[in-house]
Amino acid sequence: MDWGIFSYVIIGLTSGIGAGFFGMGGGTIIVPVMLTLGYSFEHAIGISVMQMMFSSTFGSIINYKKKLLNISDGIYAGIGGLIGASFSGLILSVIDTKKLTILFLIITFYSFVKYAFNIKYSTNAAPPIKSQFYQRLILILTGIITGIFAISLGIGGGLLMVPILGYYLGYESKRVVPLGLFFVIFSSISGTISFQNHNVIDAQVLHTGIYIGVASILGVWLGIKLIQISSPKLHRMALLSVYGLSMLVTAYNLITS
């Protein structure tokens, strides 16, 4: 096997384990690593989004079999994701790379603080949206908003979807997380097409994304197995270490670029 392909397989396995073990978007691992390997921020995002197609599909199949996924909700959120992510190529082609990298760093830092201090979103006991029509509309709008920002930064949608759906629809996080993973299937496909249409990514990036994506499927499976045998304390320390390392590597690449 070519050493380049071998390294991509290792990256895919690692990001997949992160997704299965921590429930985090692969971008937290993939983007800093690809920046370190000399890829541009746009190409790193493109590779991260392509990887999401594979890991989110595999993860959603598992969630569906475990009856954790509401397909109806997922389709409406997915429609929004298709629409929102279609703008991601335009965003990456017009916004300065350094600004996007800083925003990625801020979001990673927020995630670190959230888990370090065990900050949890409260579910609205009396959600303002009761009508089924408006509930579906909220799902679509949430998908659009999340698709625009999350795919443009190569991150999962849970960080944005959990507080929005928790407030307006009263959804608990354990219901939103599988929904967010299913949403990523739609938004990542739309985002990849948008990246291609705006010449953000090329054939080499597509091939790299496929290698990493296929390897991430095995990584997700391994991550799920690992979480079953690890203690909560070890899981928490490992999660914070990954976020901390991601911030350090991203900040280093930002300063030296």
Give names to the regions the model predicted:
Residues 22-30, 154-164:
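Transmembrane helix boundary and interhelical junction motifs in multipass membrane proteins
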Residues 14-28, 170:
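Single transmembrane alpha-helix segments in multi-pass membrane proteins
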Residues 169, 186-197:
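Alpha-helix capping/termination and helix-coil
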Residues 27, 31, 47-50, 54, ...:
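Alpha-helical transmembrane segments of polytopic integral membrane proteins
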Residues 20, 33, 43-46, 164:
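Residue-level recognition of specific faces of alpha-helices
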Residues 1-15, 35-37, 41, 62-153, ...:
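Juxtamembrane transmembrane-helix boundary motif
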Residues 16, 45-53, 82, 177-188, ...:
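Transmembrane helix-bundle signature of multi-pass membrane transporters/permeases
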Residues 19, 52-55, 59, 81, ...:
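Residue-level signal for conserved functional micro-sites within the alpha-helical transmembrane segments
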